[in-house]
Amino acid sequence: VFTPEILDEMFDIYKQHKFFIKDKNGKEIRVEDTRHMRSLKFRECLQNYFKDKDISFNFLGDGTNRMALLIDGYVYKLALDDQGYIDNLTEFKMSREAQPYVTKTYETNGLFCVAEYVTLISYDEFVKQKMRILEILDILSSEYLLGDMGWTKKNYCNWGYRKNTKDLVILDYGHMMRVDTNKFICSECGGFLSY
């Protein structure tokens, strides 16, 4: 889908840490919200690229650290900052081992990750599926530390249904990591660490 040239351009935008806009008098003003400005620059760049290539796509929306696009039936998650980049790498790493409870992530270069498209659930559906969600979280929490996917109202949009099987899965799991019991033991005294 992406040429090496557009990937280079996207990486240049990603690496940019200073953004300026012009006020009504033409004076340049530095914008502090680099994540938001990066999102706007990415959108502009991608719209032009897809128009030139005659590729249909949809912007699915922005999250805290990534934006999502739907291209040819796949979700492309684009990192808006360093945490989004790490989230893409994490999801690629965790995807295979956390099946069937998370969306499949097929590939990543850090900036983008390509993932399975699932149907987002509504808040009402989230409430109806409470027992199944808690069951999935309980299964995963036996081996993983889970972030940003628990049973709270703000996390309902991190869940969806697989298209073919209608299985309930987590679609944003960039803050998930395997439990490493060595990290709970002090390397100096051997005592238990609490966080």
Residue locations for each model-derived region?
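Protein kinase catalytic-loop region centered on the HRD/HxD motif
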Residues: 142-150
